[in-house]
């Protein structure tokens, strides 16, 4: 077993060797290096064919028509293109958008930008377990609501939203529904031929494909229109200009093909490992599960350890690559906005750790993790005056701390 152990698969994944090997065939002179938009020679035709194959592989995993897949530079761009693109196109119908407080920053900050441009956004607070109350969502819908953006799986706590029911609610009212599926694709079944979802964002690097490539699903029936945010040569049916990065697209396609074949057995394996991890640490005193095991993705476990500083815990766990909050926000020392939205106090939010498991995680690594976490929590609490006071029965909430 090699240290450190990587348990941050929700931040990114290593490229699968099968994917890397495939990508190498599309880079050099003796490979398929052409521009898929070059229609006048074989180099272009071969590149275009490779892109078509990848588009098919992606659409097959999610039950879409290949013509509904638009390649982007990643899920952040897909979220931007979906939300800004739909808002700009349909603004004559209304200027009201609904999302939730626990969305990824790529959705929240896009909505904030639209607010600056005159749109009105309602941010729904989730229930304590992270699930959106559908009655609240319904109550927030208005005649001028044009777009709802609610994610499938939360990147920090792993809870799964009921996108099927939300889709039905939106379709019945003629509201466009966008789903950020970055964390769910390849981990939960998605069938867009059945779901009433109009726009869906995907990433390559969360499921063993390369970074820098993603896709946006744009429904054809009933047809959804979006305004391009990137202008140029009119690639991707005018929705996203820019020369297609064939090697990255092929890599994403291959990653989606592999995950389609292996998803069922792999998710059962990961669910078993996640449960093993939780069962190994859940009897530690003052430990809290964030999210919902029953309604959660099989690969994410987010836990708070009361009376332990999150940063000191991460340092103590230096043999584990884990995160507190998401990679996109862990650079700041602010407690996780997702956990705060669940109604958690700052102290508990600060002591949270996200374990996210993946394709190369082993049982041996999980057992090592359990042992290390138990020892580290014990050691850090021995050093903590707060823990001592808690054990003596002092109500820490009633203490008035002196501010320096």
Curated annotation (Swiss-Prot):
Main location: cytoplasm
Residues that bind [2Fe-2S] cluster: 328
This protein's UniProt keywords: 2Fe-2S, Cytoplasm, Iron, Iron-sulfur, Metal-binding, Pyridoxal phosphate, Transferase
Taxonomy, superkingdom: Bacteria
InterPro entries from the UniProt entry: Aminotrans_V_dom, Aminotrans_V_PyrdxlP_BS, Cys_deSase_IscS, Cysteine_dSase, PyrdxlP-dep_Trfase, PyrdxlP-dep_Trfase_major, PyrdxlP-dep_Trfase_small
Pathway: Cofactor biosynthesis; iron-sulfur cluster biosynthesis
A GO CC annotation given for this chain: L-cysteine desulfurase complex
EC number(s) per entry: 2.8.1.7
Signal peptide from the UniProt entry: none
Annotated GO biological process: [2Fe-2S] cluster assembly
The keyword Iron-sulfur appears for this protein: yes
Organism: Salmonella paratyphi C (strain RKS4594)
Active site residues per record: 328 (cysteine persulfide intermediate)
Quaternary structure, from the entry: Homodimer. Forms a heterotetramer with IscU, interacts with other sulfur acceptors.
Positions bearing N6-(pyridoxal phosphate)lysine: 206
Name under which the protein is recorded: Cysteine desulfurase IscS
Cofactor: pyridoxal 5'-phosphate
């Amino acid at each position: 077993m090699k240290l450190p152990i990587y348990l941050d698969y929700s931040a990114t994944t290593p490229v699968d060797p099968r994917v890397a090997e495939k990508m190498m065939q599309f880079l050099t002179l003796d490979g398929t290096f052409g521009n898929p938009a070059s229609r006048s020679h074989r180099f272009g035709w071969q590149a275009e064919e490779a892109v078509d194959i990848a588009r098919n592989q992606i659409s097959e995993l999610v039950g879409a028509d290949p013509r509904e897949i638009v390649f982007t530079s990643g899920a952040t761009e897909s979220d931007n293109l979906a939300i800004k693109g739909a808002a700009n196109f349909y603004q004559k119908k209304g200027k009201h958008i609904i999302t939730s407080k626990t969305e990824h920053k790529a959705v929240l900050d896009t909505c904030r930008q639209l607010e600056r441009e005159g749109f009105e956004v309602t941010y729904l607070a989730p229930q304590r377990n992270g699930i959106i109350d559908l009655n609240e969502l319904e109550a927030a819908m208005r005649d001028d609501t044009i777009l709802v953006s609610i994610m499938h799986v939360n990147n920090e706590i792993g809870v799964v939203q009921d996108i099927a029911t939300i889709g039905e609610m939106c379709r019945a009212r003629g509201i466009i529904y966008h789903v950020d599926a970055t964390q769910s694709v390849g981990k939960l079944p998605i069938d867009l031929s059945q779901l009433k979802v109009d726009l869906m964002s995907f990433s390559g690097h969360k499921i063993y494909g390369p970074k820098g490539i993603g896709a946006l699903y744009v429904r054809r029936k009933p047809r959804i229109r979006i305004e391009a945010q990137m202008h140029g040569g009119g690639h991707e049916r005018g929705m996203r200009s820019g020369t297609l990065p064939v090697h990255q697209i092929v890599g994403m396609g291959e990653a989606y093909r592999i995950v389609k074949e292996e998803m069922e057995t792999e998710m059962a394996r990961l669910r078993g490992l996640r449960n093993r991890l939780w069962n190994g640490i859940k009897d530690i005193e003052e430990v809290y599960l964030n999210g919902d095991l029953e309604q959660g993705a099989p690969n994410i476990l987010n836990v708070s350890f009361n009376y332990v500083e999150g940063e000191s815990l991460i340092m103590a766990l230096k043999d584990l690559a884990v995160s507190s909050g998401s990679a996109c926000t862990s650079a700041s020392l602010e407690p996780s906005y997702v956990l705060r939205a669940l109604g958690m106090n700052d102290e508990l939010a600060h002591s949270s750790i996200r374990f996210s498991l993946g394709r190369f995680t082993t049982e041996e690594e999980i057992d090592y993790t359990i042992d290390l976490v138990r020892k580290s929590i014990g050691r850090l609490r021995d050093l903590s005056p707060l823990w001592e006071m808690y054990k003596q029965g002092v109500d820490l909430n009633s203490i008035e701390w002196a501010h320096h």
